[in-house]
Amino acid sequence: MNRLRLTLVALCLLLLAPAYAQKKNTRREPLFGKANATYQVTSNSLKGATFYLVSGHGGPDPGCIGKYQGKELHEDEYAYDIILRLGRELLKRGAKVHFIIQDAKDGIRNTTILKNSKRETCMGRPI
């Protein structure tokens, strides 16, 4: 009876361990937006490294403004999107990342034309 019980416990641990390990490596960063908020830590190659990412501009300063297909493009939106993508990759490799310029609503956007917003904050404070 003890042998059977021990076998069942071992089997349960073997079945549950991968799911637990996967959840342990799953992280969430709301700044990435709903579709990209969850990510997996796939490596510890940058463990112990800390990065402070600043996209620049934001709020009342959109940076350079251009036109594409009749629509305005604002530098700050593209710089912010790139910083989020870079930060996500750094986090996936075990780094600690601080996003200095933040926009709680934009997140990573997979569209060609990124609409301008003036919601950006600097570490939570209006710009």
Positions of PLM-derived features:
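Bacterial N-terminal signal peptides
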Residues: V9-L15
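Catalytic-site microenvironment of enzymes
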Residues: N2-L8, A19-I127
